[in-house]
Amino acid sequence: MIMYPRKQQVAGKSWSGLLKPFHILKGISFVGTYQASIHLIDTGDGLVMIDTGYLNTFYWVVNGIYSLGYRPSDVKYIFMTHWHGDHVEGVKPMLTLAPEAKTVIGVRDDKRVFERYGIKPDIVVKDADTLTCGDITFRFVETPGHTVGTVSIFFDYPESGRTYHVGMFGGAGRGALFEDNVDYYKGSRNDYFNSLARLKAEKVDLFLGNHCWNNNTDEKAAAMKANPEINPFVDEKEFYRFLDYCYTDVKERMKREGLTE
């Protein structure tokens, strides 16, 4: 399977690329779109929602939650991996349906998400912080680069006699690392490379994509439907292949543009 580059036919169209909601594991689900990944984690005592997607596809997310047998009010926490709109625009409408839910973001993105979207996070996490909901403890790792406050998320998930080591790179996009991008900040490439190195030390055998093109979410969903006996999301090498891809992709663009750092 060739992985990672996004599909051009839906690039830039947040309302396109609707995916049927599905279970990655029995307790880990996808309810997003091709353009904006959204995951639900069933902790045994409510749901954790990782990112909320765009405002104009929020209806699809809500329908997806119900279609999988949950209710929006089951959401106890909303994790924002970084402040960009494709990850946070759905936060405010989600809170109207889950008013008791607590919002969570990385310490260096909290001001920006408030300035841009009026979201005042309930919990601001820093490197190595943990948060327990139900039976699951989530660990946050600061991985700046895509934004200065990007956080990646790791947790162990027990199911069917096995414990899965689940991980998500909270901001893998490389466009923001270059000066022609509105979200570029000085030092972002160096931060990004350091983040990649840190992430390589994590143990991950179930990689959740921060976007579908991070791990070919859509193709894996189709493969699971065709053969439910094999779960293509379970792969002890894929996370590291993706990190290598990210590193090479940035280095190649730097070379093309004559950049040394």
Residue ranges and their predicted role:
Residues 54-56, 130-132, 137-241:
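Metallo-beta-lactamase
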Residues 236-261:
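C-terminal regulatory/interaction regions
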Residues 30, 45, 54-55, 85, ...:
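Short, glycine/acidic-enriched loop or turn micro-motifs at the edges of active sites
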Residues 46, 73-76, 99-102, 136-137, ...:
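Loop/turn elements at helix/coil->beta-strand transitions in domains of secreted/extracellular proteins
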Residues 27, 41, 51, 82, ...:
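Divalent metal-coordination and catalytic microenvironments
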Residues 14-68, 152-174:
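Conserved beta-strand hairpin/beta-sheet module of binuclear metal-dependent hydrolase folds
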Residues 28, 56-59, 66-130, 239-242:
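Active-site HxH/HxHxD metal-binding segment of metal-dependent hydrolases
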Residues 4-5, 11-17, 52-55, 116, ...:
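Acidic/histidine-rich helix-loop elements
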